[in-house]
Amino acid sequence: EKYLTGMTPKKILRRPGPSTQPDWGQNLPPILQRLYAARGVTSDEQLSYTLKRLASPMELRGIDRAVQLLATAIFEKQSVMILGDFDADGATSTAVAMVGLGMMGLERVDFRVPSRFADGYGLTPGIIERLRDEGELPDLLVTVDNGIAAVDGVRVAKELGVSIVVTDHHLAGEVLPDADAIVNPNQPGCPFLSKNAAGVGVMFYVLTALRKHLREINQLPDPQPNLGSLLDLVALGTVADVVPLDHNNRIFVEQGLRRIRQGEARPGILALLEVAGRDHQEISSTDLGFVVGPRLNAAGRLDDMSVGIACLLADSRDEALRLARELDTFNRERRTIEKDMKAQAQDLLASMSLDLEGLPWGLALFDTDWHQGVIGI
């Protein structure tokens, strides 16, 4: 085996199917039996994508404490800041948090998204210090799709008197941030079965647990929050983040697609489909991943993801279309930049003198002028 010098080798391992196969009977074609086995499907229940099949939110470690903090923020009219991420999962997570918490009666809620170029990823000390300098420090800060690695950012925030709820899905490091609550299926000791949840799915679960708590203490606002109306956003973030579609995630995607096809999606999602020339009644998960997702991601790649979040939060078709067209323009520009960078890389490769017998499995090319927001595609 050959690897590039200085790189850590990674092996691609086959995942064997279950040792025992269920008896599907003679009505199921062999090809479907093989496909089901490859995806770990062993029962009819796993082919049911109704919402009642979702795993319980109460299995998520830390969710009780997160709910307590959010409920207190509602009752005491505290200020809450949602700190998102600059990709599609981060944008949909932010939108779900903004809309969902508003449904629950939270009056003082706003969001911030780090700049890919000025701030880097996640909750950093610099972001907290800027909020302090601008007089925008919240009572409670909620991270979505980030935060599990923000040890220093959380420390600085707490030193300034800010309570922190981390909601994330990324793998935890050796040291966890000293947040007031952490909700992450991949944190140590969390029994939640769906380790493949996207950030938007984790935030959705926090909202379902919060609604359950408010219902139990007779504090749900009227009309009662319909969290099902957020499933179009959950489906979009789940597909766009390319997380494995386990049974739980398939439920999210199936239910979200149903809402979109029925025209019951957020105006921003319908507008993004419209500017791309797609009929919302005919869409599939492919459209979320390759049509809507890239247009949303383009904002964070080239400019500021706040534009993408504003599109998802837009209440009117006109406002959503205006922002969707702006995102479409960003995406066209992103394609041009990507095409030019690829051509430059191919020209650079063609100009190199290579020993064809001693080539490694891959070559990495670098140019300081290549766009940092596009280089990772």
What does each model-found stretch correspond to?
Residues 8, 16-140, 160, 178, ...:
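Hydrophobic helix-and-loop "lid/oligomerization" segment in the mid-to-C-terminal part
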Residues 129-200, 204-221:
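Active-site cavity-forming subdomains of large catalytic enzyme subunits
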